[in-house]
Amino acid sequence: MAVRAAVAGASGYAGGELLRLLLTHPEVEIGALTGNSNAGQRLGALQPHLLPLADRVLEATTPEVLGGHDVVFLALPHGQSAAVAEQLGPDVLVVDMGADFRLKDAGDWERFYGSPHAGTWPYGLPELPGARAALEGSKRIAVPGCYPTAVSLALFPAYAASLAEPEAVIVAASGTSGAGKAAKPHLLGSEVMGSMSPYGVGGGHRHTPEMIQNLGAVAGEPVTVSFTPTLAPMPRGILATCTAKAKPGVTAESVRAAYEKALADEPFVHLLPEGQWPATASVYGSNAVQVQVAHDAAAGRIIAISAIDNLAKGTAGGAVQSMNLALGLDETTGLTTIGVAP
């Protein structure tokens, strides 16, 4: 019997990518599609690439519309998911693609998001130690942020093997879709094309506490993170360059061995052959993650680089992967590691 899924926030980039993936998922039947500001409009006018759903009409996001589904995906702006989720029954699998339930520390949430903390749900990054067990059978899932997905998958093997000191410096470039679909002057083509620019510098980006939370949990001690995000002139993709001070005695061989061990059985995270480097173009449209690692002996640092599609593995693909685990399906169901090139 098919799993009936509703999508709240179907008109945005994350909601559109989720629907693209669900259309080819063999176990999912797409139910209600909602979007408050676009209620009453045809989906085809807002997401013209989703031809099989073009004539579906968006409804208001209400408990009555979302009720009666096995799974409800919330692709809503940060701070809006909690009010919707509390109106859904405990037997409904609710997958929040926003930030509302990712952080464990209420102080971090209030400092970075400026509203009361709604709580914490099982975290939808299965590759982290212990995460799969928490997701299996769960009825509530918090999908990670796109930057924390890229950074955590790049660095967790080093911390799991106790190779890195508890401080990391991260510079990550993201495509413009990470900023959402709403019109913003700095995302105009004339502003973005042919240019790169940092933002959220000096610890101001909202994804910073999420990275600290993830890496600290793996390391078993607090990890200091300096994160500088950069806007890149491309629609989608993240390239994260992450460095951490190596502990005494660490070698290139020990680093490589730790990453090979940590990622050997992961269906979506691929450690590239030595000498080959991650590229956002290689994971475009897929749930794949490319990782490469190096040891800078002169500087005494571990350099881990990852590439993801921010809308796929970084959002919608991660949501589907986590849903699969919660429902007892193979976690790769409906997902691909095949990118689109050129």
Curated annotation (Swiss-Prot):
InterPro entries reported for this sequence: AGPR_AS, AGPR_type-1, NAD(P)-bd_dom_sf, NAGSA_dehydrogenase, Semialdehyde_DH_NAD-bd
GO cellular component, one term: cytoplasm
Family designation: Belongs to the NAGSA dehydrogenase family. Type 1 subfamily.
Active site residues per record: C146
Protein purpose: Catalyzes the NADPH-dependent reduction of N-acetyl-5-glutamyl phosphate to yield N-acetyl-L-glutamate 5-semialdehyde.
Gene3D superfamilies per the UniProt record, alphabetical: Dihydrodipicolinate Reductase, domain 2, NAD(P)-binding Rossmann-like Domain
Keyword Amino-acid biosynthesis recorded: yes
Annotated localization: Cytoplasm
Reaction catalysed by this enzyme: N-acetyl-L-glutamate 5-semialdehyde + phosphate + NADP(+) = N-acetyl-L-glutamyl 5-phosphate + NADPH + H(+)
Name of protein: N-acetyl-gamma-glutamyl-phosphate reductase
GO biological process: L-arginine biosynthetic process
Pathway(s) of this molecule: Amino-acid biosynthesis; L-arginine biosynthesis; N(2)-acetyl-L-ornithine from L-glutamate: step 3/4
EC class: oxidoreductase
Keyword list, A-Z: Amino-acid biosynthesis, Arginine biosynthesis, Cytoplasm, NADP, Oxidoreductase
EC code: 1.2.1.38
